[in-house]
Amino acid sequence: MNNKSKIQHPDTHFKVMDLIHKYPDISQREIAKQASISLGSVHYCLRALGEKGWLKVKKFKNNPNKSAYFYLLTPEGVFQKSRLAVLFLRRKKQEYDQMKLQIDALSKELYEKN
C-alpha cells in the first residue's frame, strides 16, 4: 500500500463505498464527480479498499467499453461502510452542534447591538 491510500480521510472511503453500494457499475469519473474528489483520489481509494478486502472489482465481459468495471463491496466492506457511516454521522452531528452554538452566539450578539 502506498502512502496516499494510507492517509485518505475516512469520509472519502465512506463516500466512495456508499456510491459503489448504490451504483455497482458506477465509473471512477462519476464517483469523483459525485463525491467531489479527484479522479486520482478515487483510484487510490479503490486500490486501498481492495487491499483491505472490502471491495472486489470485476471487468465487464463482452462490453465495447473495455474500461468498464463492476464494483462489489464484500461482506466485510458492507460492515465497514456501516461503521464508517456511524462515525460520519457522529462527526457531522458534532460539527452541526458547534456551528449552531456559533450561530446562536452571533445572533445574540447582533440582537443585543440593535
Task: List where the protein language model places each region.
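Amphipathic alpha-helical dimerization/coiled-coil segments
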Residues: 80-114
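Short, cationic-aromatic polyanion-contact patches
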Residues: 3-13, 27, 58-81
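Key DNA-contact positions within bacterial/archaeal DNA-binding proteins
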Residues: 29, 40
